[in-house]
């Protein structure tokens, strides 16, 4: 977990923006790239660099490995309709994403931990795979035994808002996926560029 957090902060500094909107992100104090050359003048950035940075931002944001993310994109590319929207729908319909987006946990890392420890159900059945994909109408719920976990209690008592494609019931600790979102529906705290992700992978297909 510590390694993951260090990596996420590194990506935030490369983007010069807090990827999750966290006030604890060191980018707020060191708004330059990491490493000994972080303060050096910025050279002209190539298209490939921008594309690679875009796909890395998405991978880091959703905590997905390279191979798994490539598989997600491949599925989005083969699907009907707009590839960018397909990609976002697949990423946002993961159980870890829905739980995080509901506001019932403070971070996507907390969501993943609850899921892996079998504290979460989907339609009443325990799910311990973070990449489990939900369908419209599916209900995710935090189990009773996790109701007193400090980060869950704090999140449930907060006034955080959830996007319109989710229906949250804080008393029942549940969230329902009403509709698969498109890119413009998702409240990213930083600029995310799925079009560059499409360009990145399209050149490899």
UniProtKB/Swiss-Prot annotation:
The keyword Ribonucleoprotein applies. It comes from the Bacteria. GO terms for molecular function: rRNA binding; structural constituent of ribosome. One of its GO terms (cellular component) is small ribosomal subunit. Pfam families: Ribosomal_S4, S4. The lineage of its organism: Bacteria, Pseudomonadati, Pseudomonadota, Alphaproteobacteria, Rickettsiales. Belongs to the universal ribosomal protein uS4 family. This is Small ribosomal subunit protein uS4. Residues 93-171 form the S4 RNA-binding domain. Keywords: Ribonucleoprotein, Ribosomal protein, RNA-binding, rRNA-binding. InterPro entries: Ribosomal_uS4, Ribosomal_uS4_bac-type, Ribosomal_uS4_N, S4_RNA-bd, S4_RNA-bd_sf. The keyword Ribosomal protein applies. CDD domains: S4. Gene3D superfamilies: Ribosomal Protein S4 Delta 41, Chain A, domain 1, RNA-binding S4 domain. GO terms for biological process: ribosomal small subunit biogenesis; translation. One of the primary rRNA binding proteins, it binds directly to 16S rRNA where it nucleates assembly of the body of the 30S subunit. With S5 and S12 plays an important role in translational accuracy. HAMAP family: Ribosomal_uS4_B. Part of the 30S ribosomal subunit. Contacts protein S5. The interaction surface between S4 and S5 is involved in control of translational fidelity. PANTHER family: 30S 40S RIBOSOMAL PROTEIN, SMALL RIBOSOMAL SUBUNIT PROTEIN US4M.
């Amino acid at each position: 977990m510590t390694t993951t957090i260090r990596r996420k902060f590194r990506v935030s500094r490369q983007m010069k923006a807090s990827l999750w909107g966290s006030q604890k992100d060191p980018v707020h104090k060191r708004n330059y790239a990491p490493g000994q050359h972080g303060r050096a003048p910025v050279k002209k950035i190539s298209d490939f660099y921008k594309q690679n940075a875009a796909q890395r931002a998405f991978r880091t944001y959703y905590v997905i490995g390279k191979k798994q993310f490539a598989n997600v994109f491949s599925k989005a590319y083969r699907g009907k309709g707009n590839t960018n929207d397909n990609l976002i729908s697949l990423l946002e319909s993961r159980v870890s994403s829905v739980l995080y987006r509901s506001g019932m946990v403070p971070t996507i890392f907390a969501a993943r931990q609850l899921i892996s420890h079998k504290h979460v159900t989907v339609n009443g059945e325990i799910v311990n795979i973070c990449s489990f994909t939900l369908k419209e109408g599916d209900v995710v719920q935090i189990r009773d035994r996790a109701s007193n976990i400090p980060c869950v209690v704090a999140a449930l008592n907060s006034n955080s808002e959830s996007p319109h494609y989710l229906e949250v019931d804080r008393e029942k600790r549940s969230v329902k996926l009403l509709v698969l979102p498109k890119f413009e529906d998702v409240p990213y705290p930083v600029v995310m560029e799925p079009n560059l992700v499409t360009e990145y992978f399209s050149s490899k297909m």
